[in-house]
Amino acid sequence: MRNNDDAWLLVIDPQVIFAAPSSDWAAPRFDEAMDVITGIAPLFGDRVIVTRWVPEPPYRGSWQAYFKRWSFANRPSDDPIFALVPAARSLSRFDPVDLPTFGKWGRRLESLLGPTPNLVLTGYATDCCVLSTALAAADSGALVRVVADGCAGSTDENHAAALHLMGLYDPQIKVVRSRQV
């Protein structure tokens, strides 16, 4: 495992939609994970990227059924529900990477970080966007560490299940605690 000298902290979707208790997608441990994220971010200096999930109509294929099921999230991308939470706004010197997909790894991040970066993943929700990002990044050759206590799932059970699944990809994906970063 490489050290943090070349590692990038990727903070997945620290947005109001996952933080607000009134949201259908509220992550019950959002604040606990955010405390971990803000605690480890200084270890990465300028190597921090924050992402946002934002819808991008018109919806094609399975996204049509998805937004029928989760109609509350079918809003303009500038709706306040998609804003970064205050604690995330100053984490990165870069503008947030906005994408309409669960997985954030792809051409945009690859152009910023290179094809096979050393990634440290945190964010929301463990069982959706973090999982999707980790698998795609590892599949393309990135070394991925997922900070278990720097993520929050839709439920504690789903969080644990997603961490278990990602742990099956060792050595490409390692699940660690913040004290190991």
What are these model-predicted stretches?
Residues 19, 58, 155:
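Conserved protein kinase catalytic core
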Residues 5-7, 22-54:
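A short alpha/beta connector and helix-capping loop motif
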Residues 8-14:
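N-terminal nucleotide-binding beta1-loop-alpha1 segment
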Residues 16, 55, 152:
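Short, glycine/acidic-enriched loop or turn micro-motifs at the edges of active sites
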